[in-house]
Amino acid sequence: MYRQHEHQSTSAECGCKKGAVNSENNQFIGVSHGGKTTKIHAVVDALGNPVHFLLTAGNIFDASAAIDLLSGVNISGSNILGDKAYGAKSIRAYIAEQGASYTIPPKSNVVEPWFCDFHTYKERHLIECFFNKLKVFRRVATRYDKLAVSFLAFVHLASIWILLK
């Protein structure tokens, strides 16, 4: 039987410096109502095929990652569909600067509402269908991976599997 010294600790700290590559700060784990979670932000094409991914902590607002997500993809000449959370003026301005159009419905309390083609907006179900296909993979749905790099790698593998089906 192995016994520890009385002052020896089995601390949960990893001994890493703050901001280090493998520290808790960089693993995109945020505390929200459902517990510790990670959000997967995705861009899909017109057929619902995945194009680009981004991870954030679960307590981060979706719109704060939108410009970073869209900057990873060439969006010129395309129509960006998004829900009401992505209707911020800065996001709409970024999309217009890139030479793309947007179909994002305004919130009910917005001061200056803009036009939204709801017939085109119905195509937004493609991203929801993609996430339903992605959540079939239990490892993605429950995040078994400690490191964000490993989790994102498996999200990519699951996306490849979805594309091959």
What are these regions (language model features)?
Residues 73-74, 117-119:
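Short hydrophobic "helix-edge" motifs at membrane interfaces and signal-peptide entry regions
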Residues 11-13, 113, 126:
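Mature extracytoplasmic/luminal segments of secretory-pathway proteins
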Residues 1-107, 158-159:
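Polybasic low-complexity intrinsically disordered regions
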Residues 93, 98-101, 109, 118-165:
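Basic, amphipathic alpha-helical segments enriched in Lys/Arg and hydrophobic/aromatic residues
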Residues 64, 111-117:
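Short, charged, surface-exposed secondary-structure boundary motifs
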